[in-house]
């Protein structure tokens, strides 16, 4: 090993790239307040996509600089990279975003070297960061009502102000106080030790701003989220006060776009969120505020820890086998793993590259709470003993170019992970009458909200939707999605002759992007009762004019409101 091998220089250049990424990330994030105040909703969508793409762009730039500054024989000597890791640890020790900088280092290493060279000696498979920082207090503001809830609420909104005035602050405060008293037991509202703690920075996403914190006494606590809207021409409206943990969990769901929020010390804020949402894994919380790569790191660490400490084995996921993807899971780990088959069913008019493109598209669009977020992985290596034999046999049969056996190790060259849900078709098979109605209502609403966000699912079969633990219907099969404005919605032409009407084949031409909503009922529902109920609930989905109207609104630049919470006593404009 050369004595003067430039480990510190390489480490510093990697960290310089991270600093550049963080500066651009902060710049986009800090602009969220102004975009909200000025109601620049299309700019908000553009900024969200730009921030997601930023990470890979900056990784590419950093790798290019490394290749420019160091000779290949030096840079690519993997035996020396433990020295780079050691030097890197020493220069990130005083940072407030050190856990993110470890993930950045891993991304650079994986961009330079093949994944079979990954080891904890060369990169951060396990974090070296102290857990102490997560226990430190986040930057918050605390308010005590001291018997005057109305006065406390007034103090909160005296601190959280915008360049645009509140439209009706007195009326909003009266409504919030009523909601607070409705949501919490009377004894809590009268408790002299009652306190409200809010994170100092406002969270922004889509057309909303959110105050996030908790309400607590000496004995108990409740999460607290207060969403704000900007009603153009009228000002800022305080939209709701939410204290239900399940509802707050949905706001931070894996089906939502990422928040924009100023977090000087990310781990402190994540610790604060974890305190009010103990059921959320930190991987999901990091992802929810835009640090999706670090969320991926924390997910992987949780996965390898689960495999090391349980007897769980991979099995094929329940449900109808996919025509494009093969899906497997761990019973004790709330995730599915999706790989692309080598051969697709004949009815599928897509190829592997198109499928990859579709899944990556989902990362950058507004998922409006109706599409599961994904993480993409390359070169997963798992012990052979962790696979149920029938599962491994099926994977090797349907995707031999992706899954292979190397001694006692199973190599999965490429896969996506998604949150595991109950397939909607299986859910309906076991649901009572009320549950069927609720699920079909939400299924139609999911299709409508996706469409209004300019996403057409393509294949809308029940098996391609899942039901979350909160009972929400979510789309998760992306190989046929497209932008709604790309589809050509048509009415079925009237038959020209009696022979046309009796023909087994269409009497009209069909283009590759043509969609005939009148064909949906028998296509979506084999069960006649479910078909009839869905027609009552969402019959407009069978009319091409409904879809064309949405297309016109989207082309006119309208950005829809999709609320991740229930709204009380407000208009639904």
UniProtKB/Swiss-Prot annotation:
Q: Which UniProt keywords apply?
A: ATP-binding, Cytoplasm, Glyoxylate bypass, Hydrolase, Kinase, Nucleotide-binding, Protein phosphatase, Serine/threonine-protein kinase, Transferase, Tricarboxylic acid cycle
Origin: domain of life: Bacteria
Report the EC number(s), separated by commas if there are several: 2.7.11.5, 3.1.3.-
Residues that, per the record, bind ATP? 317-323, 338
Mostly located where?
cytoplasm
Pfam families named among the record's database cross-references: AceK_kinase, AceK_regulatory
Q: Name its cellular compartments.
A: Cytoplasm
Biological-process GO terms, alphabetical: glucose metabolic process; glyoxylate cycle; tricarboxylic acid cycle
Entry GO CC: cytoplasm
State the protein's name. Isocitrate dehydrogenase kinase/phosphatase
The organism's taxonomy opens as: Bacteria, Pseudomonadati, Pseudomonadota, Gammaproteobacteria, Pseudomonadales
């Amino acid at each position: 090993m050369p004595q003067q091998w430039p480990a510190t220089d390489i480490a510093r250049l990697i960290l310089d790239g991270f600093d550049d990424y963080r500066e651009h990330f902060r710049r986009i994030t800090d602009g969220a307040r102004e975009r909200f105040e000025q109601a620049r909703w299309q700019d908000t969508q553009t900024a969200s996509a730009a921030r997601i793409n930023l990470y890979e762009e900056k990784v590419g730039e950093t790798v290019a600089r490394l290749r420019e500054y160091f000779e290949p024989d030096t840079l690519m000597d993997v035996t020396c990279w433990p020295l780079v890791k050691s030097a890197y640890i020493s220069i990130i020790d005083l940072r407030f975003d050190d856990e993110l900088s470890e993930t950045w280092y891993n991304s650079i290493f994986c961009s330079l070297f093949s994944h079979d060279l990954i080891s904890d000696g060369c990169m951060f498979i396990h974090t070296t960061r102290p857990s102490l920082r997560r226990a430190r207090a986040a930057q918050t503001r605390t308010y005590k009502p001291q018997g005057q809830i109305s006065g406390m609420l007034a103090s909160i909104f005296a601190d959280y102000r915008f360049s645009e005035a509140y439209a009706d602050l007195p009326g909003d405060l009266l409504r919030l106080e009523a909601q607070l008293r409705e949501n919490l037991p009377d004894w809590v509202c009268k408790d002299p030790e009652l306190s409200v703690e809010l994170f100092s920075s406002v969270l922004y996403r889509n057309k909303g701003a959110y105050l996030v914190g908790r309400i607590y006494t000496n004995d108990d606590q409740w999460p607290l989220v207060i969403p704000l809207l900007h009603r153009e021409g009228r000002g800022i409206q305080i939209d709701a006060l939410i204290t239900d943990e399940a509802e707050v969990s949905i706001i931070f769901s894996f089906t939502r776009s990422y928040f924009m929020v100023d977090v000087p010390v990310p781990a402190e804020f994540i610790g604060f969120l974890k305190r009010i949402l103990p059921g959320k894994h930190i991987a999901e919380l990091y992802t929810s505020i835009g640090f999706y790569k670090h969320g991926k790191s924390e997910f992987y660490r949780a996965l390898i820890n689960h495999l090391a400490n349980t007897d769980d084995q991979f099995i094929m996921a329940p449900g109808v086998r996919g025509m494009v993807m093969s899906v497997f899971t761990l019973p004790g780990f709330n995730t599915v793993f999706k790989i692309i088959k080598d051969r697709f069913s004949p009815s599928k008019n897509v190829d592997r590259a198109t499928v990859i493109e579709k899944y990556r598209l989902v990362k950058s669009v507004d998922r409006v709470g109706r599409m599961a977020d994904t993480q993409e992985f390359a070169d997963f290596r798992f012990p052979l003993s962790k696979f149920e034999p029938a599962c491994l046999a099926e994977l090797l049969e349907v995707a031999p170019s992706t899954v292979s056996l190397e001694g006692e190790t199973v190599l999965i060259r490429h896969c996506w992970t998604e949150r595991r849900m109950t397939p909607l078709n299986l859910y309906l098979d076991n649901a009572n009458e009320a549950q069927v109605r609720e699920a079909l209502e939400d299924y139609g609403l999911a299709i409508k909200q996706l469409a209004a966000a300019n996403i057409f699912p393509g294949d809308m079969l029940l098996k391609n939707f899942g039901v979350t633990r909160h009972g929400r219907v979510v789309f998760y099969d992306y190989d046929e999605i497209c932008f709604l404005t790309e589809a050509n919605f048509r009415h079925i032409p009237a038959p020209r002759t009696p022979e046309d009407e009796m023909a087994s084949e269409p009497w009209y031409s069909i283009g590759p992007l043509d969609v005939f909503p009148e064909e949906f009922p028998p296509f979506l529902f084999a069960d006649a009762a479910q078909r009839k109920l869905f027609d009552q609930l969402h019959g407009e989905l069978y009319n091409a004019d409904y879809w064309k109207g949405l297309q016109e609104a989207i082309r006119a630049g309208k950005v829809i409101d999709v609320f991740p919470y229930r709204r009380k006593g407000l208009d639904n404009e």
